[in-house]
Every structure is written in C-alpha cells, then in structure tokens.
Amino acid sequence: MESAKYTILVVDDEELMRYLVVSYLSKLGHSCLTAIDGVDALDKIKRNKIDAVITDIRLPKMDGITLISEISRQYPGLPVMVMTAFDEEYSERTAISVGAQEFLKKPFTLDEFAARLNKMINDAEVLKRMKSEKPADENLQELMNELEKTLKNS
C-alpha cells in the first residue's frame, strides 16, 4: 500500500464541509485530520506531523484569523489555505497578511481547490529546501528573502 502524499488538517465547524473536503482529499491520496475550531486545530498540529492546514474564517472558540496568526508564530513555514463563504475583501487581505498562503471563496470547483492546494504545498516545500541549504553568499540570501516575500504575497 502506498503511503499518503501529505497529511492535511481540515478546520471547519460545519460537519458536512469537513466531510466533503476530507473525502475529496482522501481520493487524491492525502491523509487528513479534522478540527472544529482553532483551539482543537492547534492541539492537532502540536500532536501530529501536519503538512498543510485548510481552515474556515468563522470558527467557534478561536476564529480563523487568530488561528492563522498562531500557526505563523508557532509553526513558521506550515502552509495555510483559507476556504470560506465569508465574502469580504478585508478577510482575504487580513488572512494573507497574518500568514495564509491561499484564500479560496466558497463555492469553488474541485479542480481549482486541488490546483491551489498543490501549488501552496509545493511552494512551501521549495522554500523549506532553500532555507535548509546554506547560501553560498549574501546575494543568494537576499534572493531567497525576496522569493519568500513574493510567495507570501501571491
């Protein structure tokens, strides 16, 4: 049996949405964990090796923006995608500014979801590899910093 591609944490207080996302990700070969709020999500991240997080904005106990901020602070480099029906430009700007790499508004197509998730995870892996390799000189370090800013803002 082939091992899962990635372990993805799906955070949403709506059971149906969690079920649909997990079912789709499982068909793509990913392993999934779920959480119903930000507090539960941080606990799952602490206890498991998570490759990516997909979260809603509106969550009980700890909202998605606070969750993203905490992930960025405690687990830098862990990619986060927001998927929400909460349609305000403020939410997208805020989520990206606190550390989300992708912002997907519901409803969305499965193809769009998969493409953006794969891009986000691949970008995070490239950045991680680049950071783990010792830069040959300061120019390369500056280039890496610029690439990180570009990836964060794309």
Predicted regions and their residues:
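Two-component/phosphorelay signaling modules centered on CheY-like receiver
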Residues: 15-33
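Acidic catalytic/metal-coordinating carboxylates
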Residues: 37-40, 63-66
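Active-site T/S-Asp motif of two-component receiver
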Residues: 55-56
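Receiver (REC) domain active-site loop signature in two-component systems and cognate sites
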Residues: 59
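Alpha4 helix (beta4-alpha4-beta5 surface) of REC/receiver domains from two-component response regulators
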Residues: 66, 87-102, 115
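CheY-like receiver
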Residues: 122-154
